[in-house]
Amino acid sequence: MGKKSRVKTQKSGTGATATVSPKEILNLTSELLQKCSSPAPGPGKEWEEYVQIRTLVEKIRKKQKGLSVTFDGKREDYFPDLMKWASENGASVEGFEMVNFKEEGFGLRATRDIKAEELFLWVPRKLLMTVESAKNSVLGPLYSQDRILQAMGNIALAFHLLCERASPNSFWQPYIQTLPSEYDTPLYFEEEEVRYLQSTQAVHDVFSQYKNTARQYAYFYKVIQTHPHANKLPLKDSFTYEDYRWAVSSVMTRQNQIPTEDGSRVTLALIPLWDMCNHTNGLITTGYNLEDDRCECVALQDFRAGEQIYIFYGTRSNAEFVIHSGFFFDNNSHDRVKIKLGVSKSDRLYAMKAEVLARAGIPTSSVFALHFTEPPISAQLLAFLRVFCMTEEELKEHLLGDNAIDRIFTLGNSEFPVSWDNEVKLWTFLEDRASLLLKTYKTTIEEDKSVLKNQDLSVRAKMAIKLRLGEKEILEKAVKSAAVNREYYRQQMEEKAPLPKYEESNLGLLESSMGDSRLPLVLRNLEEEAGVQDALSIREAISKATATENGLVNGENSIPNGTRSEDENLNQEESKRAVEDAKGSSSDRADAVKE
């Protein structure tokens, strides 16, 4: 049986500092909020801003050292209590056990043979920590008054977790005591570990995540110290950055969507037991049974007794896994890198290209993706590139010519080129673009592989270098693939080969051999990460919770086929009101949080 323990707040002991007055921290957090609320830095200035923000955060952390909430013992000491609590409240606890798998960390191990598609795990709603349970908790009064909490479910869930952790008699203590004491998300990276990500695509999201989390903490520190509805929160006397970083990471690595009790909408939830499962390639096998009001998971494959039980977290890139889940997944069949493309408004054919793209349902500017698997581009990216490289005559054919509608619908089908010349142009463009992106990195693929052989690297440093290496390998594969395609279509053009007759096809825009089953992935703005989060506006901030940002440790969500996070679906007007409300209250509490 796990060691019984009451939650405690460390106020003395090794490394603990003298008690710091709230006023002193208020001054520091005000400075931090001001710094984090400044306009986005110009090109090449992101690292400088990151270091400045980090310096302030570290100053706060140093003054708060020893004041964070902790538990006695190790998390595994409390596993028996978790299993007992889960069993007493209707969850399944037979057929598996929690085990430390070393490199993968803790996970579930089968204690009997489990067949593929067999229901082996279910967790009833009463055990879940949700936005709804947050509203009905001690956090409720503040939630009802704070627009940021209302607009950003992930932050509400993080505060719910903090409040329950600080309450020894909380119903969820058996679960909370088994959560990791720290994570490997970039919020926990040392400055030198983040430095390994410089010049990568992922580093922009890392900077944004860190800045947004610091801004949130600074804003809510003042709220907790000054808002009348925060007086009864157990965080009143101790709300440290360390605590908030832990809560944000716990939520971003574990949150999932489930239906509300009436099934009319979705809400965010933490799901005990189930969130112990580690990831592998496959399909989402978790759903929510509204009739029995419980989360259910069937086996992804046959698992023999003694084997680790895996689930599929969703079609996420390694950048998403590292930033939002804190791990790198080798051989990720869904890995990809972003590529921002757009038709220039100075292009004399802009209007015609924009019209063709609009008819195909594709924006004139978007974040697409280059994939790890073949083919490296999706049907929508193929369609965009075809339009991007069209001549005036080809554009007219797609707008006014015979069978113009059919031409639009086959834009994304690799079997029906617009023209051989168009294919040569688009693959040449893609080859050049990917080559240019490769040149922006400060190290080569060979250099990264050499560095990884250094056994002195920390786990997080290795993860960062693997991510850097993975980006370059995807780009290199795209260059090679584009070159092969370019030469193939050049040969077709030289031989004056007849073009396939598109009229014979009933295939739609996205039903292409060049496409893949992930569509329309490339037009999702790559989820809550919203592109690379350049020049985040206040509205973008509130409608997209950085703490959430795709941070699903156990799957895209708990509903099959993976809808996205609550924040992605926020009504824009509600988000706008949330910001305005936060702004209006700045004179009383703090400036608005701008994520």
From Swiss-Prot:
Name the UniProt record assigns to this protein: Actin-histidine N-methyltransferase
Reaction(s) the record says it catalyses: L-histidyl-[protein] + S-adenosyl-L-methionine = N(tele)-methyl-L-histidyl-[protein] + S-adenosyl-L-homocysteine + H(+)
Superkingdom of source: Eukaryota
InterPro entries: Rubisco_LSMT_subst-bd, Rubisco_LSMT_subst-bd_sf, SET_dom, SET_dom_sf, SETD3, SETD3_SET, SETD3_SETD6_MTase
Subunit and partners: Interacts with MYOD1.
SUPFAM superfamilies named among the record's database cross-references: RuBisCo LSMT C-terminal, substrate-binding domain, SET domain
Localization: Cytoplasm; Nucleus
Function of the molecule: Protein-histidine N-methyltransferase that specifically mediates 3-methylhistidine (tele-methylhistidine) methylation of actin at 'His-73'. Histidine methylation of actin is required for smooth muscle contraction of the laboring uterus during delivery. Does not have protein-lysine N-methyltransferase activity and probably only catalyzes histidine methylation of actin.
Pfam families tied to this protein: Rubis-subs-bind, SET
Keyword Signal appears in the UniProt entry: no
Organism listed in the record: Callithrix jacchus
